[in-house]
Each structure stands twice: as C-alpha cells, then as structure tokens.
C-alpha cells in the first residue's frame, strides 16, 4: 500500500478521512477515519479568578484558540440583572453582585468565568510590558542599535481596570520614548524607561 492521503481534514465537530491505494494492483483502496480535533478555547479574561467590573461598565470578552470547525454558539449569564452579555461577548455590569458567564462552543466545550460588579472603579493590581509587534514580554534589559525603534504595550491586571500608562526616559539623548510607548535608540549608552 502507498502513503496515506487526507481526503477530508478532521475538525472539532467532524471526523476526517484518509485513504491509501495499493501500489502493486492500483485498484484496491483502504480508508480510515481521522479523529475529531480536541476542542480548545482561550479567553482574554481569567477563568480561575473573579473578574471585577464597575457598575455600568462594559467590557469585550474575546475568544481565540478555537480548533478548526469550532465556533461560539452561545453566551449566557447566570443573572442578567447583575451582568448582561451580548451574542458577541460584550459584558455589562448592571447591578452590584456576582454572575457567571458561560460560553458554549459548537463542539460542546464550555468555558465559564465569574464577574463581580462593584460600585467603585476597578483598581489595577499589576501590569506587564510587551513588545507590541511580537507580543513577547519585555525583559528588564533590552539591547537596541542606534536608530532602532521598539514599541511597548502595557497589559493591566485585571483587564477591566482602565489605567492611563505614561512613559519616560532617564536620558532622552540616549533613548527617547513618546506617549504611545515607542522607544527610539538615539546614541550609544544606557537609559532607563519608566512606565
């Protein structure tokens, strides 16, 4: 028998199919099913912690990392009076309290997270700095060539806090940084960028 050829790729909701043909006789074929893909989901909110949300605040929950063929089929709230959710994943804090948001996929996989609506603003507890282009975390020391640019991106925890990030350089002659987090290496030396 020859090598396997995929006739239909597997998805999260449907098995795939592969076949191989007899290399000697040319006519005989063997077909086999390919297992469905394992359903997966990633959210831009923590599923293992309570997500704080200010009263009347809205936040867009984003879904990513779905296996081929899968999609979100429903968003539901355990208590719409406290937290409402649209069919696109936008949550809104309507009343002080807690509610669970449930996301169901076509494959049957579900994800849940708890939202706690509070009167006061959501305070930032920590933040991380990333390279906006590569989305990789920035190390404490970064080497740059003269003329090179690096754009910073700050991610706050919790994601529902709304901090205003500012950037400054200890030596603008060596490395300057603008209000959008773009660092420009000016000349050889060391400078500290503060966020």
Feature names for model-found ranges:
Residues 1-39:
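Extracellular modular ligand-binding repeats in secreted and cell-surface proteins
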Residues 15, 23, 37-195:
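Extracytoplasmic soluble-region selector
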